[in-house]
């Protein structure tokens, strides 16, 4: 009976005229077998080489349109940006983000425009990012001190970076450290593990019983309840504290919760108001998107440097020359690190943290003569575009020099390089995330020389990927630090 119901609910893309080409399908499950094996972004790139840069897959009941070229990405994210301005909802977003009311997954409309404006103008503006410099600086110095205390020993740098970025985000959001902070971060990590990849229940939305059969609903709800309880405690603490008229905590800087609570208070003159559930959803967004993306990028950058000692030395020489010439480390120093910025750009090309950018087609449209059905899920494969020889010479070779004096960057105007997306749905936290990435890398390179553990050759360093909310390095990066320059004073 269940199979009969599923077959009845299946869309039949072959009966849709002019739909993009795609691979063979099986009854009920459709094209799912094609994604078994390699990580999805690599499988989809291989399929695109056979079926073209605009293709369709039938995954269960859902039609997917796969975009694998800069030209078609521009059609989706610029020419028809409004048509593709929503994101598909899922079990994960509905539970964790309170009915998809966060910034990243809320449907395109008035609510999304308002929360996006709050994010761009107040939460993650360049001014706000600059104001968080003392937190970043203090926490990175703490990390440097901890690593220095283990000089000559093997340090799990992946774990250290992960903890650092989550701590920076916690302090930025909460204003201070809380006893519950570590438990909250632990829950966020568990949620990210669960949310990676394709959830079978989302591919058969009419079969709600799959949510219970796979136990995904109960797992998400359990973690969400724990995180909700912790956030409730922290928000109540903020409300209890004395605040000025503008909502700033007396005797301290305004944190992200303070900013959001200004929109919860109906007695203010704000034209737009947020519920506590909305505020929690936005905070989850900042943690899940901001922290994981930054940590993943730092980890890949250090791994690629260790893979090629010549590139590592180039990056170290630049950092040390500029820091020593200026005699201090501040954001103007970071701005001068041209080679490091090029290196990060190359990391984002070959290791985009989120290689599959999800959009939803709000209404049927046509792209280059192909019919794109309403409610179909569109995936822009930024990894496929970033490794296409049409746009990049020797695309599989790691070469930071390709970005030196190049006009191409990661801010969504160059469709051959889209690590953070483009258009209305471009990642709003780019400035926040890159500020963390650049400072951490600069200080790790300045203060330490790095070597691999005994028995591991540079060229043999394992760069195997693990697909999740982000595509991270599967094996933790473990290195041996040796102090090169004086540590910051405590």
From Swiss-Prot:
PANTHER family: CYTOCHROME P450 71D11-LIKE, CYTOCHROME P450 FAMILY 71 PROTEIN. Belongs to the cytochrome P450 family. Its cofactor is heme. InterPro entries: Cyt_P450 (IPR001128), Cyt_P450_CS (IPR017972), Cyt_P450_E_grp-I (IPR002401), Cyt_P450_sf (IPR036396). GO terms for molecular function: heme binding; iron ion binding; monooxygenase activity; oxidoreductase activity, acting on paired donors, with incorporation or reduction of molecular oxygen. It is an enzyme of class 1 (oxidoreductase). This is Cytochrome P450 71D11. Its EC number is 1.14.-.-. It comes from Lotus japonicus (Lotus corniculatus var. japonicus). Keywords: Heme, Iron, Metal-binding, Monooxygenase, Oxidoreductase. It comes from the Eukaryota. Heme binds at residue 427.
